[in-house]
């Protein structure tokens, strides 16, 4: 089965449409070259056609993540391509991070940052587009790429995108070609192997950062956390905490969106929502312990999601939000240490840092605060 991330299917559609536009025959599979000289992959294409008397082209692909419950599974992708003469083909960059020969448009259903209106697209996805489209570009031409995800807006409403400041659709934030199944035993095995490898390196200084998912990885890199210390964990946090202690980690930072890490504060250490949730219940419990008014506690308990509960609190009582999440960050550290010490005696220091819906580091436990301060980072107030 072709288990590729959404950016791969987007680039495959764009490449197919470009091939048709420059006169090449339609192929039901496109060869996609990967960054860093990795081997290329073959990606199925549904259809491709010329439009407007050959002035534009359109290709369609369907994302096959291989995961039955993945939000991008089966998503239809439309890639519109148009070439223009007189474009520049240098390596210069424009404001949105693309080379000046590539005019990228996030169409309907593609996520955009609410603050800037710019497309939410990872560097991996940008590189993938450039690597695969540039060789097809006629000399002296530039290319306009518009991506549309007809179901993107509806699918995104079932995610936490808005909590990261991303609106209007699905993010194109994959950091690799192949899908990592975050709740599978194979993913745990692979992550443990990566952890052991990092801890065995001569330059290892005893410090690691666990980031949760693609958004966590994206923000960790933007904040300048040491890349050689970062591991994307997926959902197997409990076993990985123990593995970190077993491999001699001295300082561990848990860095992520509160929607995932909230579960740790309630003692839930496998965080995939199909296996364990309880976030509203945990949030309600913490609000009670912090002495939040009964009316607000009742609103929280009846919320349909953590995000909605937060929005309610932010409007009605911003001070309560700060109290709840500060307590939560501390509880994450306490519960995580207790979890590790259930299985082995360890002096590993565990810190937690949570970011908010505006993609800002907002809350940290005492150990988390020490660790980010040592890196020259401060919390947003």
From Swiss-Prot:
Gene3D superfamilies noted in UniProt: CbiD-like
Domain of life assignment: Bacteria
Pathway: Cofactor biosynthesis; adenosylcobalamin biosynthesis; cob(II)yrinate a,c-diamide from sirohydrochlorin (anaerobic route): step 6/10
Keywords, in A-Z order: Cobalamin biosynthesis, Methyltransferase, S-adenosyl-L-methionine, Transferase
Statement: the UniProt record of this protein carries the keyword S-adenosyl-L-methionine: yes
UniProt xrefs under InterPro entries: CbiD, CbiD_sf
One term of GO molecular function: cobalt-precorrin-5B C1-methyltransferase activity
A GO BP annotation: anaerobic cobalamin biosynthetic process
Class in the EC hierarchy, top level: transferase
Name this protein carries in UniProt: Cobalt-precorrin-5B C(1)-methyltransferase
Gene name linked to the record: cbiD
């Amino acid at each position: 089965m072709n288990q590729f991330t959404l950016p791969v299917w987007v680039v495959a559609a764009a490449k197919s449409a470009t091939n048709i536009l420059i006169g090449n025959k339609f192929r039901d599979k496109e060869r996609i070259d990967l960054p860093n000289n990795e081997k290329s992959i073959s990606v199925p294409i549904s259809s491709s056609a010329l439009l407007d008397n050959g002035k534009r082209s359109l290709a369609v692909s369907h994302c096959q993540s291989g995961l039955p419950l993945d939000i991008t599974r089966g998503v239809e992708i439309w890639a519109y391509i148009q070439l223009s003469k007189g474009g520049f083909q240098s390596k210069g960059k424009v404001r949105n991070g693309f080379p000046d020969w590539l005019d990228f448009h996030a169409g309907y259903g593609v996520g955009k940052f609410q603050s800037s209106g710019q497309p939410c697209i990872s560097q991996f996805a940008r590189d993938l587009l450039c690597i695969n489209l540039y060789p097809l570009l006629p000399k002296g031409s530039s290319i306009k790429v518009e991506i549309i995800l007809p179901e993107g807006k509806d699918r995104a409403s079932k995610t936490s995108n808005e909590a990261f400041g991303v609106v209007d659709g699905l993010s194109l934030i994959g950091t690799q070609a192949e899908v990592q199944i975050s709740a599978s035993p194979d993913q745990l095995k692979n992550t443990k192997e990566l952890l052991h490898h990092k801890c065995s390196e001569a330059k290892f200084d005893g410090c690691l950062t666990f980031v949760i998912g693609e958004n966590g990885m994206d923000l960790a890199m933007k904040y300048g956390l040491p890349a050689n210390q970062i591991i994307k964990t997926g959902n197997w946090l409990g076993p990985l905490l123990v593995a970190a202690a077993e491999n001699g980690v001295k300082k561990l930072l848990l860095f992520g969106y509160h929607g995932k890490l909230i579960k740790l504060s309630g003692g839930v250490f496998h965080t995939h929502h199909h296996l364990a949730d309880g976030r509203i219940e945990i949030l309600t419990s913490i609000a009670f312990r912090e002495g939040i008014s009964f009316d607000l506690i009742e609103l929280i308990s009846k919320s349909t999601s953590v995000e909605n509960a937060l929005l309610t609190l932010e409007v009605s009582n911003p001070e309560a939000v700060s109290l709840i999440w500060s307590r939560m960050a501390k509880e994450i550290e306490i519960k995580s240490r207790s979890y590790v010490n259930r299985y082995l005696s360890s002096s590993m220091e565990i810190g937690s840092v949570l970011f908010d819906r505006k993609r800002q580091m907002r809350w940290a436990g005492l150990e988390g605060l020490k660790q980010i301060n040592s890196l020259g980072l401060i919390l947003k107030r």
